[in-house]
Amino acid sequence: MKDNYILAFETSCDETSVAILKNGSELLCNIIASQINSHKRFGGVVPEIASRHHVEQITVCIEAALEEAEISADQLTAVAVTEGPGLNGALLVGIMAAKTFAWANHLPLIPVNHMAGHLMAASLVDTIEYPAMALLVSGGHSELVYVEKEGSYKKVGETRDDAAGEAYDKVGRVMGLTYPSGKVIDELAHKGQDTYNFPRAMMNTHEVEFSFSGLKSAFINLVHNENQKGNDVIANDLENLAASFQAAVVDVLMAKTKLAMEKYPVKTLIIGGGVSANQGLRERLSAEITDEKLIIPPLRLCGDNAGMIAAAAYIEWKKGLENVQAGLDLNAKPSLVFEDM
């Protein structure tokens, strides 16, 4: 049988990435050009800057991917690209590049949901036994997705307000940390203790939903109130603050994940998204998820990358191109959700 090679593009936010996947499991290359340093001074991603960086880097990434994989365009089976969700301008850069490459080389074009990519990154690590549950946590999303069988996605829970990663970044700003602050908060948390009684929203409800806005507000209010008393709690107790905040986030994520798995019994639990790099969350999952297979991708596959997009595209390709192939009128879908697939 002829080998399957998928060239994938990911430009949904602030990483320009191009990857080539062989036969759905062998990642030949996963080129990532990060823009973090360009966004740090703004405390978050600036869409216009992100788009300009994608334009500058996309061709370089394509050339690097083909060179590293030692693959020529005529060996490729298909081109895949993130169509959403994400920043509109950023998505369009990747989509235009993918459409141009596909058209020029007479290749089919497969659109991919960015969150399906985060989910299917697990398939690059281990075999997913179905049915499966996925906890997807990032700067823009916190959701639980039930995967009854390969390529079937049902969102069963999500955040009502802030995503977990968004809460980390906002709290990090209050702490005086540079963007992105999740890794630093995680490191500080491991040096401190859970000494502050921060709220765990919706812990006692039977709804598979998250809420982190109350936690964020409680953190900000505590810091403000302590400052009013003359206690610079950020300077005096930063590690315990970080530990208490992270404990609250992880408690909620764990509780709702377990609730989802009670409602939808599964064989595998997958974790994906940028926040899945959090060591505190990884430790809790490894300690408490013992009856189901647990797949946690390595750090290189947690953030945005085209390798995961290729993995999700391979699943779509197996459904038959007549069912999944996009035309050259493919457009960005910044608010794409699983229900739209």
Curated annotation (Swiss-Prot):
**Binding-site residues, substrate:** L136, V137, S138, G139, G140, D169, G182, D186, N278
Q: How is the cofactor bound?
A: Binds 1 Fe(2+) ion per subunit.
The coenzyme or cofactor needed here is:
Fe(2+)
- Mind listing the GO biological process terms from this record? tRNA threonylcarbamoyladenosine modification
What is the catalytic activity of this protein? L-threonylcarbamoyladenylate + adenosine(37) in tRNA = N(6)-L-threonylcarbamoyladenosine(37) in tRNA + AMP + H(+)
Which compartments is it annotated to reside in? Cytoplasm
This protein's GO cellular component annotations are: cytoplasm
Q: What is its EC number?
A: 2.3.1.234
The record's section on InterPro entries has:
ATPase_NBD, Gcp-like_dom, KAE1/TsaD, TsaD
Q: Which residues form the signal peptide?
A: none
Tell me which Pfam families the record gives. TsaD
User: Binding positions for Fe cation?
Assistant: H114, H118, D304
Which family does the record claim for this protein? Belongs to the KAE1 / TsaD family.
Tell me, in a sentence or two, what this protein's role is: Required for the formation of a threonylcarbamoyl group on adenosine at position 37 (t(6)A37) in tRNAs that read codons beginning with adenine. Is involved in the transfer of the threonylcarbamoyl moiety of threonylcarbamoyl-AMP (TC-AMP) to the N6 group of A37, together with TsaE and TsaB. TsaD likely plays a direct catalytic role in this reaction.
According to UniProt, the name of this protein is tRNA N6-adenosine threonylcarbamoyltransferase
Q: Organism source for this protein?
A: Lactococcus lactis subsp. cremoris (strain SK11)
